[in-house]
Design a protein with these regions (language model features):
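Terminal peptide-recognition signature
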Residues: 1, 5, 19-20, 38, ...
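Conserved CoA-thioester-binding segment of acyl-CoA-metabolizing enzymes
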Residues: 1-41, 57, 260-269
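C-terminal long alpha-helix characteristic of the crotonase
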Residues: 6, 114-119, 170-221, 227-237, ...
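Hydrophobic alpha-helical membrane-association signature
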Residues: 16-19, 76, 222
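Glycine- (often His-adjacent) and acidic-residue-rich active-site loop
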Residues: 32, 40-83, 99, 129, ...
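Crotonase-fold acyl-CoA enzyme core
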Residues: 82-197, 232, 246
Length: 269
């Protein structure tokens, strides 16, 4: 997926949110697509929210596209990242340039985040008189730790790829001309030897473990998943292929063969 408003440094709009969510829906429904890579067109990944409305950019009374729920207007960045959170396939962000505001926070639900040498990251919300968006107050501390998350959000300072790597915001730095090819290689490593349904369940198990209060909660889900997967054709193929020293050919499909207990969480998004 390519954020494709290079003339605006891929500034984020409600339409971009809708198109990204539609793309995630389509990719998830297509069993031939095993992972998604997201990058930006041109020299930026995403320069943040489109500020063409000037001082009224963040004023809810000027938001003609608001999605409202109960007594609040839902943040469009959060609607997007919650869709990513529920996604059933690996998400890789290949950050090709500056990523500011929502450009930085939208990457946090990614399973792997890599960046070019030209990338920069800035959680600049407090500098604009607002607060972190896109569920980043939940994601960011879990990725970089609470003290570093507060440092980045209080100050709004822009960090380069090297510091992003040092604090585990990204996992690797790449030459700009190699970024997408390297992201594809990483995606292939993630998916080529593993069963798609096992990846889907594992992704949700690990991300949702942050909301569990006791390891017993994880034990319950793992037990159900092991029983379900252990009786599947994929498990038989996994064992047989190992014993026969050949690559596995997993046939169970996300579109039709997810276990009965899935999803196990209350969906309030």
């Amino acid at each position: 997926l390519l954020l494709n408003r290079p003339e605006k440094l891929n500034a984020f709009t409600f339409l971009m949110m809708e198109e990204l969510i539609s793309a995630f829906d389509a990719i998830e429904a297509d069993d031939n697509l095993k992972a998604v890579i997201i990058s930006g067109a041109g020299r930026a990944f995403c320069a943040g929210a489109d500020l063409s409305s000037g001082k009224d950019t963040f004023n809810p009374s000027f938001d003609n596209f608001a999605v409202k729920q109960d007594d609040f207007r839902r943040d469009s960045g959060g609607i997007l990242t919650l869709r990513m959170y529920k996604f059933l396939k690996p998400i890789i962000f290949a950050c090709n340039g500056p990523a500011v505001g929502i450009g930085a926070s939208m990457q946090l639900p990614g399973d792997i985040r890599i960046a070019s040498e030209d990338a920069r990251f800035g959680f600049v919300f407090n500098n604009r008189g607002i607060v972190p968006d896109a569920c980043s107050s939940w994601f960011l501390p879990k990725i970089v730790g609470i003290s570093k998350a507060l440092d980045l959000t209080f100050s709004g300072r822009i960090i380069e790829s090297k510091e992003a790597l040092d604090i585990s915001l990204i996992s690797s730095i790449h030459k700009p001309e190699n970024l997408i090819d390297d992201a594809i290689k990483i995606a292939q490593e993630l998916i080529e030897k593993s069963a798609p349904i096992s990846i889907a369940i594992t992704r949700q198990m690990l991300w949702r473990s942050f909301g569990q209060s006791d390891p017993y909660d994880a034990h319950v889900i793992e037990s159900k998943a092991i029983d379900s997967r252990g009786a599947s054709d994929d498990a038989k193929e996994g064992v047989n292929s190992f014993l026969e020293k050949r690559p596995a050919k997993f046939k169970n499909l996300i579109s039709s063969d997810m276990p009965d207990f899935f999803p196990w969480w209350d969906d309030n998004a």
